[in-house]
Structures are given as C-alpha cells and as structure tokens.
C-alpha cells in the first residue's frame, strides 16, 4: 500500500512524532511512503527506512502527490496542515484534498485523524 505523508512547516515536529510512534507500521514491507521534500528528509531521520520524496509543497509536491491520487496509486494521504498560516500554494492543497474526495482516498489532516487512518490501514 502507498501512503502520502505531507506536513506544513508548523506541523513537521508533529508529523515526526506521529511517524516515530508508528515505525513498525511505516517500515512494513508492504508499505510505501511518498512525501514532499523536507517532510521526507525529516521522516528518514526519524527512522523510516524507505521514502520516495517528491518536490516540496510550494514547488509542486502537493500537485505531484495529487496526480498519484488521480492515477489511483495512493491508498491514503496524511497531511498535517497548518490552518493558521498562509500558503502560497493553497490551490495545490485544495486540489489534493478535492482529488482525495473524488477518488475516495482517505485523507487525514490532523494527528488524531491520522491515527484512525493508520489503524484502518494496519488491518488491511
């Protein structure tokens, strides 16, 4: 299964904590992780063994992951958004969220929702 992990700058520490708490899941043989740039670097340092990194969000990474959703290559997206900050690539973020809805791909935008998605996926 393929899971997208994305986090805004203000949520990167939360994403790292989230991943570290679930390293056994994220390092499973059947789990592939796709991340945006800096998030991927931080997750690798947190102990995830294999990560496919795309561009950073503002440079098109959210759109790249959105394209994977549209091609039905993603099983879930965990996107820790910072709703209190402005993002120049907001149209890409909205497009990614819309594509998840269109293609029925689970999308978690906070820690607790992410936990629920991982619990669901771990039973697949």
Regions found by a protein language model. Give the residues of each.
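Glycine-rich, flexible N-terminal cofactor/catalytic loop recognition
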Residues: 16-33
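Short hydrophobic/aromatic-enriched beta-strand-loop microsegments
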Residues: 49-60
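Short internal beta-strands
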Residues: 29-39, 43
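Mid-chain, well-packed structural core segment of small domains
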Residues: 59-98
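General beta-strand structural signal in soluble alpha/beta enzymes
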Residues: 34-36, 53-55, 79, 107-111
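Ser/Thr/Gly-rich flexible loops in soluble cytosolic domains mediating phosphotransfer, phosphorylation
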Residues: 85, 93-124
């Amino acid at each position: 299964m393929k899971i997208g992990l994305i986090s805004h700058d203000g949520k990167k520490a939360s994403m790292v904590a989230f991943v570290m708490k679930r390293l056994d899941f994220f390092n499973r043989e059947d789990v592939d992780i796709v991340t945006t740039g800096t998030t991927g670097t931080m997750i690798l340092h947190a102990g995830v063994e294999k990560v496919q990194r795309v561009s950073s969000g503002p440079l098109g990474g959210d759109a790249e992951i959105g394209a994977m959703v549209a091609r039905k290559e993603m099983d879930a997206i965990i996107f820790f958004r910072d709703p209190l900050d402005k993002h120049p690539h907001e149209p890409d973020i909205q497009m990614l969220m819309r594509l998840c809805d269109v293609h029925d791909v689970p999308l978690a935008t906070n820690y607790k929702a992410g936990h629920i998605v991982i619990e669901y996926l771990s039973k697949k």
